[in-house]
């Protein structure tokens, strides 16, 4: 499995994604926007078909990507997830913009209390990939009840070109309406147009996507709300993304 931060979909040309327990942190090249202070490294979660947790193997960090193996010892569907929860702050220091990401516990220590133009957001981000050995199963797909999540109606490893797939989006375990969904097919560097598909969840949190062709797709959902916000944050930003493979019929 490859994990990277890139500008073009499914190409490794920027920096590796840093994950706890994958490779040595000292091997990872420096990266991130100017003025961004150190951010927490997320943990990789691998859920087996029976719902148990599995450890990654042979992890390494390269110049442009992190890599690891997953032993598919069970038949069924595995869920690979990277989730991050915390705070994001921005302010000015000596006239220069500063940004910070971290935990609520470290906020008071790392961020000046009277920082100029201080803005604080409560953030939760989740990225997922689904892998199936043999017939698809559903036990590993159960939501955690935290942040913005995908609850499949159509199995994520049972997607076909020309067919509609249905998903339900949850916020803290409950269906959420009006979530903006963006779906982009891979190979965008070879197209003049992005080919983006836009959709929005209905009142029951449901959305339907029809895949125009076979291939790899990036699906992203974002939501900004003032519900469930804890101080010092004034808003909540939640995002979800998944890499999906669509097969020819």
Q: Where on the chain are the PLM-derived regions?
A:
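Short, aromatic- and glycine-rich surface loops/edge beta-strands on solvent-exposed regions
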Residues: 76-87, 216-223
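Short amphipathic, basic-aromatic surface patches that mediate peripheral association
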Residues: 5-34, 171
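A cross-kingdom marker for long, charged
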Residues: 206-249
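A surface-exposed beta-strand-loop module
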Residues: 59-75
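Beta-strand-rich domain onsets/edges
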Residues: 101-165, 170-176, 190-191, 234-249
């Amino acid at each position: 499995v490859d994990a990277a931060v890139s500008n073009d979909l499914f190409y490794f040309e920027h920096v590796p994604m840093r994950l706890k327990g994958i490779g040595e942190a000292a091997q990872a090249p420096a990266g991130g926007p100017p003025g961004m202070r150190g951010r927490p490294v997320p943990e990789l979660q691998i859920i087996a078909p029976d719902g148990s947790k599995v450890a990654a193997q042979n992890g390494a960090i390269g110049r442009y990507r992190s890599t690891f193996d997953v032993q598919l010892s069970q038949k069924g569907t595995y869920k690979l997830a990277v989730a991050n929860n915390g705070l994001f702050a921005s302010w000015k220091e000596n006239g220069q913009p500063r940004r910070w990401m971290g935990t609520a516990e470290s906020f008071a220590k790392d961020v000046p209390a009277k920082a100029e133009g201080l803005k604080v957001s409560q953030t939760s981000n989740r990225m997922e990939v689904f892998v199936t050995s043999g017939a698809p199963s559903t036990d590993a797909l159960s939501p955690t009840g935290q942040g913005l999540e995908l609850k499949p109606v159509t199995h994520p490893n049972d997607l076909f070109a020309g067919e509609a797939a249905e998903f339900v989006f949850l916020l803290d375990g409950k269906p959420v309406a009006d979530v903006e969904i963006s779906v982009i097919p891979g190979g965008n560097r070879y197209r003049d147009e992005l080919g983006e598909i836009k959709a929005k969840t209905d009142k029951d949190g449901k959305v339907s996507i029809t895949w125009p062709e076979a291939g790899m797709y990036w699906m992203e959902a974002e939501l900004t709300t003032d519900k469930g916000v804890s101080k010092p944050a004034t808003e909540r930003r939640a995002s979800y993304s998944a890499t999906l493979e669509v097969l020819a019929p």
